[in-house]
Design a protein with these regions (language model features):
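Phosphate-ester processing/binding pockets and catalytic centers
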Residues: 1-220
């Protein structure tokens, strides 16, 4: 059986306590057995446009109006998918882990997939297609792509020829927009203590782990 994961991230790679810098970095993946939810997202967009609701090129939780967010969450909370999230409090990362953006990104992905791959891939015969939201500008994107490829190679439970990865903008795939919404809800909970939207999807969360929850050590 072919399984699908769509993943996004929240937070930044600024390891400082300056204003407007995230406290956490979160990698969030949703697992689907089919991509029907993507068709439902497109149908919702068309319906909203028909009703005269201004919608940009795609759904994006940070920029969408509260009215549109409500419509999207009303849709996705009734769909069948699983959510997996690795949460890293950046100030607790030792120096070698935050030596570069690339290293830190790879670290987050490694522990997410290490701890969730047995749940994502149920049988050795399964196939996996991983679609990851591209990060920032095109320059340097290959480093992040290589990081995820390497992590998958280390953690996958199926033959190397049975999985594929692709990196693209959220605009290119409505299932990535679902991942964006889930990641946004998680970030609101962790950064602001606001679980309003998180509560709408929490029944779908199969893994949500604060990497260094047991540590009181901060390194900046």
């Amino acid at each position: 059986m072919r399984r699908f994961i769509f993943a996004d991230e929240a937070g930044d790679f600024d390891f400082s306590r300056k204003q407007n810098v995230s406290r956490y970095f979160i990698v969030c993946a949703i697992r689907l057995n089919s991509c029907e939810i993507g068709h439902e997202m497109l149908r919702l967009r068309r319906d909203l446009l028909w009703d005269g609701i201004p919608i940009p090129d795609y759904f994006h939780a940070t920029k969408d109006t509260s009215f549109v967010r409500e419509k999207v969450f009303s849709l996705i909370e009734n769909q069948d998918f699983d959510i997996y999230a690795q949460v890293l409090e950046k100030s607790k990362a030792i120096e070698k882990v935050r030596a570069s953006k690339h290293v830190f990104y790879k670290y987050a992905w490694f522990y997410l997939l290490k701890n969730t791959m047995p749940r994502i891939i149920e049988k050795h015969e399964d196939q996996l297609m991983a679609t990851i939201a591209s990060i920032g500008v095109r320059k340097g994107q290959q480093d992040y792509s290589d990081a995820v490829q390497d992590v998958l190679a280390q953690t996958q439970r199926i033959d190397a020829g049975s999985w594929r990865t692709t990196f693209c903008s959220c605009a290119s795939d409505p299932c990535l927009q679902v991942a964006d919404y889930c990641t946004w809800a998680l970030q609101r909970k962790w950064e602001r203590g606001d679980s309003t939207w998180y509560d709408r999807i929490k029944s779908k969360i199969r893994y949500e782990y604060d990497m260094w929850a047991g540590s009181n050590s901060h390194f900046y």
